[in-house]
Amino acid sequence: MNLDDFSDLIERPDGGLRRDAEERRERLSVPPGALGRLDELAEWLSAAQASVPVTAIRQPRVVLFAGDHGVAALNVSARPAGSAHLLVRAVLEGESPVAVLARRAGVPVRIVDAGLDCDPELLPTEVVRHRVRRGSGRIDVEDALTIEEAEQAVRLGMAIADEEADSGTDLVVLGDLSVGGTTPAAALIAALCGTDASVVTGRGGAGIDDLAWMRKCAAIRDSLRRARPVLGDQLELLATVGGADLAATTGFLLQSAVRRMPVILDGVVSTACALVGQRAAFRAPDWWLAGQVSGEPAQAKALDRMAIDPLLDHGVVVGEGTGALLALPLVQAAAALGAELPERPEPEPESEAAAEAAAAAENAGIEDVT
């Protein structure tokens, strides 16, 4: 598998239709510019949907890829290594932020186990049936995956994207459920942006102290040494310093762009996968939105590289798809306004007699003044 092949498969949203949407916006009853960024979102959606006016979002879906990362054994995360299945369980039981928000919004949540480090019996079959391997390798000293596992994970993500597109999903809220996942995400971003480990090392969704931050920075530094020799091959890069969930997320993003299915990115993990996807197919980011600022420096670096501006900045750092889901109502509002606001009525053309009378009255007024 060569991820660069996606470059020939992905087209940008229709630019002509976007211009048509912009022209229609000029004719709406609300003055141009009065709706701010909502106008831009509606025009983007219109091009993505190939529909003018834009169609309301009717079937959004939250998709969360789950996995454990061996690097968590270095105590670079506030959560114990191998405990990502507890995050999955919290979502399934409706006790996590993303589960609460999804329930309130009426949006279904799909969890895909790409690489959890737990017994499959602990979770429902529909979650664990796609697992590529049990946990990912410790990327500072070994590959996260074999090249065969990396390809399997990418194909898993592609298959999930196809299933969602075929079922009618018209917008995906994309997130992750991982322990240690922000470390390989930061390593991928640092490698692709050519920056140092200290620039991209954050404190994760659960927060870590200064000693853990230094351990995390050292792990990213050592991972970068292993990543740089394979920068020319994105699949090998994912195998070297990614992970099963990150490779699956990358495949999902690329195939979603092929299927013309828009995606809202969440935090640094999904953003890192998007950056890998951009390296493989430069048009792909035109299908993605960034839901929010996650507080991770690596996310800011990657979004700047892709020229994507986050929709929200409320200091929400919990991850797990929460920030992207918070942005969903904004996107839905933009679509609803673009679809339902009426156009201004065209002024009725003056009759020839009325035009002559108006001209005569104007001339008479001029003569009176003189």
Report residues per predicted region:
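N-terminal loops that bind phosphate or other acidic moieties
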Residues: M1-T370
